[in-house]
Amino acid sequence: MPKMKTHRGAAKRLRVTASGKVKRFRAYKSHLLASKTPKQKRRLRHPALVDSTDRRRVARLLPYEA
């Protein structure tokens, strides 16, 4: 069986933690920020974890990381 290819777009956006969880960046932080409150923007700074329901989908995109 040939090697599986890593989805390069996913590899640039997602990181696997030491415990095996998948970390992602939050959306809505690139433009149109004047209308968002400072609290909203502050919360968007911190990364989030990919939901457990999407973990199998991410594992297919990142076969050697997840």
From Swiss-Prot:
The yes or no answer to whether the keyword RNA-binding is present is no
Q: List the SUPFAM superfamilies hit by this protein, alphabetically.
A: L35p-like
Superkingdom of source? Bacteria
Mind listing the UniProt keywords for this protein, alphabetically?
A: Ribonucleoprotein, Ribosomal protein
Keyword Metal-binding present in the record's keywords: the answer is: no
GO BP annotations listed: translation
Annotated Gene Ontology cellular components are:
cytosolic large ribosomal subunit
Q: Name one GO molecular function term.
A: structural constituent of ribosome
Pfam family of the protein (one):
Ribosomal_L35p
InterPro entries given in the database record:
Ribosomal_bL35, Ribosomal_bL35-like, Ribosomal_bL35_sf
Q: Which PANTHER family does this entry report, sorted A to Z?
A: 54S RIBOSOMAL PROTEIN BL35M (PTHR33343), LARGE RIBOSOMAL SUBUNIT PROTEIN BL35M (PTHR33343:SF1)
Which family does the record assign?
A: Belongs to the bacterial ribosomal protein bL35 family.
User: What is this protein's record name?
Assistant: Large ribosomal subunit protein bL35
Q: Which organism is it from?
A: Moorella thermoacetica (strain ATCC 39073 / JCM 9320)
